[in-house]
Amino acid sequence: MIAFLFATQARAQQFNIAQVNDSLWNLTLAVDGDTSLWQLKYPVYRFATADINGDGSVDAVVGVYKASRFFTTPNRRVFIFKNYEGLIRPLWLGSRLSGELVDFNIVDNKVRAIEKAKDRFVVSDYSWNGFGLAMDSVVYTSSSIDDCYHFLSIIKQ
């Protein structure tokens, strides 16, 4: 189980994620002794927390592997959940970033993503634009996926 604890607006909140089986994960939010549950019926490859939308409350950022309405091939996606009055609510259930998502990390409350381009890999920063994630800038490019993971300083999963 991965857990993060933050004090937000004088209330303690804690997002956790736990695997139930190979395709079911429980995302939980504990706020002042109460717990909210959101079931994710997809494999999870990454979990992080950050104040993505800048509202002063920590959000859960979950990488899932699934198909979407517009992209029917299963692939890696980014879902963002918020704390709404002590309940887990979707903030953004992304179907795609700019390119094919390989992995992501959180840097300065932004999503830093490795994406596959035609002949290389691109590391880009994405920030909240009021509706979803918008690319701020490309911060690194390489023909080597390992170089991109090293740049992100995360373990390949």
Question: Where would I find each of the regions flagged by the language model?
Answer:
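Beta-propeller-forming repeat regions
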Residues: 10-157
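Bacterial N-terminal signal peptides
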Residues: 1-5
